[in-house]
């Protein structure tokens, strides 16, 4: 009996030590919590609600403080469903921001925004935990070395080459192939890549997350027999989850990648699909918090939120982070604030075209809209640069002639222009290639094409060495 009493008194004293607040208002994922005077939690502190409601329903909700309202109240946003929460229930201030396990034990596993595993093999046993809100590296720590990151995708390697340790955006509307291209890059790069990869599913379809997981198991990037030999960590905050999860899952993925870069001094690949869902989640949260949106409807803090995520994704003298991000373009409008704000942070932009997808040319990459800061002769070399410029000039001339062809017909063009059109049509089709991840759809075995092979192919088309061949060849 004495032992039981002492144990109970210990439990009560532990509860007294905790900083507990009580819900005063619950509006969907937004929660108002009142604390004792002088006990207000800091911005970004996580609050935890555990226990049972009067109906006997188990409650386990983590939320993040977003605003200090005054009168000892804070406003927090939940990272999971708030079903079963009631006014008057207690929420414990953890005294720290959301923190997640990092390190080798996360490889081969699927985690949620809190770093909790959502797959079968049991808990993630890690001795190291990092907060998800971290500062970007100092200027003196940044690495400015320039080198090309070969992908095996012809059109990207030639016309908009990716920078090793840079940020790359795959921009396009709905259904033009962004996620397939992400999976191709994971397949082409992650298997040959010496370091590790982290993939963040930000507000995307659960089916796509499952497809990616299965694809990685098949290609042995995730090793089910020996999970410690896996090369990728997956972090998902899917479409059915509250905006608080989608808004922070990018930060969780970045935190896991930073451990491998800064502590293990490795080269890391960070895949984010889709960056627009991060913006949309921020917009939802902003509206729920009562902030006044500007004319287009996005949050007034769009630039700050995007900058705080993107500036962390960089290369330091310890290791590099190469980030490949899918950027959904609403209504195919590249001037929309979300893709426009994202593109300001990118080293290369691969733009996917609905017109090319309609023609059945995959990957449907628009060679004239796609850009890269690496397309300089002193970086890629004179031969690569001259070939790329020749391709762009031929395609640009073809684009200018299309109105004339539509009105007057091909026969009204000069001999030189007819030749340009014939070569441009070959160039338009030449970047098309079968992918390993698309074998199930078209039955064609995938092809990895090296950069020298790509340059050689275009160099044969430009001067007319292949004029005798039909377009389909």
UniProtKB/Swiss-Prot annotation:
Keyword tRNA processing assigned: no
NCBIfam families, A to Z: atpD
Chief location of this protein within or outside the cell: plastid
Subunit description: F-type ATPases have 2 components, CF(1) - the catalytic core - and CF(0) - the membrane proton channel. CF(1) has five subunits: alpha(3), beta(3), gamma(1), delta(1), epsilon(1). CF(0) has four main subunits: a(1), b(1), b'(1) and c(9-12).
Family from the record: Belongs to the ATPase alpha/beta chains family.
Sample GO molecular function, one term: ATP binding
Keywords: ATP synthesis, ATP-binding, CF(1), Chloroplast, Hydrogen ion transport, Ion transport, Membrane, Nucleotide-binding, Plastid, Thylakoid, Translocase, Transport
GO biological process assignments: proton motive force-driven mitochondrial ATP synthesis
Alphabetical list of PANTHER family matching this protein: ATP SYNTHASE, ATP SYNTHASE SUBUNIT BETA, MITOCHONDRIAL
TM helices/strands, residue ranges: none
First and last residue of the signal peptide: none
Record flagged with keyword Lipid biosynthesis: no
InterPro entries per record: AAA+_ATPase, ATP-synt_VA_C, ATP_synth_F1_bsu, ATPase_a/bsu_AS, ATPase_alpha/beta_chains, ATPase_F1/V1/A1_a/bsu_N, ATPase_F1/V1/A1_a/bsu_N_sf, ATPase_F1/V1/A1_a/bsu_nucl-bd
Location(s), subcellular: Plastid, Chloroplast thylakoid membrane
Top-level class of the enzyme under EC nomenclature: translocase
Organism annotation: Microlepia szechuanica
GO cellular component: chloroplast thylakoid membrane; mitochondrion; proton-transporting ATP synthase complex
Domain of life: Eukaryota
Any one Pfam family match given in the protein's UniProt record, by short name: ATP-synt_VA_C
Binding site for ATP: 172-179
Functional note: Produces ATP from ADP in the presence of a proton gradient across the membrane. The catalytic sites are hosted primarily by the beta subunits.
Topology of the protein relative to the lipid bilayer: Peripheral membrane protein
Name assigned to this protein: ATP synthase subunit beta, chloroplastic
């Amino acid at each position: 009996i004495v032992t039981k009493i002492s144990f109970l008194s210990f439990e009560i004293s532990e509860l007294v030590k905790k900083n507990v607040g009580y819900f005063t208002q619950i509006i969907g994922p937004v929660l108002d919590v009142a604390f004792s005077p002088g006990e207000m939690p800091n911005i970004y502190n996580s609050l935890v609600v555990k226990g049972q409601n009067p109906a006997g329903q188990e409650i386990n909700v983590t939320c993040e403080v977003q605003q200090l309202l005054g009168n000892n109240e804070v406003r927090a946003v939940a990272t999971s469903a708030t079903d079963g929460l009631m006014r008057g229930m207690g929420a414990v201030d953890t005294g720290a921001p959301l923190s997640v396990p990092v390190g080798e034990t996360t490889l081969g596993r699927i985690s949620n925004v809190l770093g909790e595993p959502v797959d079968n093999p049991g808990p993630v046993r890690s001795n190291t935990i990092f907060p998800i809100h971290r500062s970007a590296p100092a200027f003196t720590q940044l690495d400015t070395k320039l080198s090309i990151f070969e992908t095996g995708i012809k059109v990207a390697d030639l016309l908009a080459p990716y920078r090793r340790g840079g940020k790359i955006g795959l921009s396009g509307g709905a259904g033009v192939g962004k996620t397939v291209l992400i999976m191709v890059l994971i397949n082409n790069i992650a298997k040959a890549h010496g370091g590790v990869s982290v993939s963040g599913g930000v507000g995307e379809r659960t089916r796509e997350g499952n497809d990616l997981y299965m694809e990685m198991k098949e290609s042995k990037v995730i090793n089910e027999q020996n999970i410690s030999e896996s090369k990728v960590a997956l972090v998902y905050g899917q479409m059915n989850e509250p905006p608080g999860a989608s808004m922070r899952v990018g930060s969780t993925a970045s935190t896991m990648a930073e451990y491998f870069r800064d502590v293990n001094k490795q080269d890391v690949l960070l895949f984010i699909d889709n960056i627009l869902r991060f913006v949309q989640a921020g917009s939802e949260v902003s509206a729920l918090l009562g902030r006044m949106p500007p004319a287009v409807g996005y949050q007034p803090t769009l630039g700050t939120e995007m900058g705080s995520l993107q500036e962390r994704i960089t290369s330091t003298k310890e290791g590099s982070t190469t980030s490949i991000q899918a950027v959904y373009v609403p209504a195919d409008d590249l001037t929309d604030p979300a893709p426009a704000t994202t593109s300001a942070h990118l080293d290369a932009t691969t733009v996917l075209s609905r017109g090319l997808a309609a023609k059945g040319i995959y990957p449907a990459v628009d060679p004239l809209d796609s850009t890269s800061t690496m397309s300089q002769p002193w970086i890629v070399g004179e031969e690569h640069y001259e070939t790329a410029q020749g391709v762009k000039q031929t395609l640009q001339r073809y684009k200018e002639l299309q109105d004339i062809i539509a009105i007057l017909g091909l026969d009204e063009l000069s001999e030189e222009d007819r030749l340009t059109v014939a070569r441009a049509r070959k160039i338009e089709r030449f970047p098309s290639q079968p992918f390993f991840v698309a074998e199930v759809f078209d039955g064609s075995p995938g092809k990895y094409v090296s950069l020298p092979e790509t340059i050689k192919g275009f160099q044969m088309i430009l001067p007319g060495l292949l004029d005798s061949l039909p377009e389909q060849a």
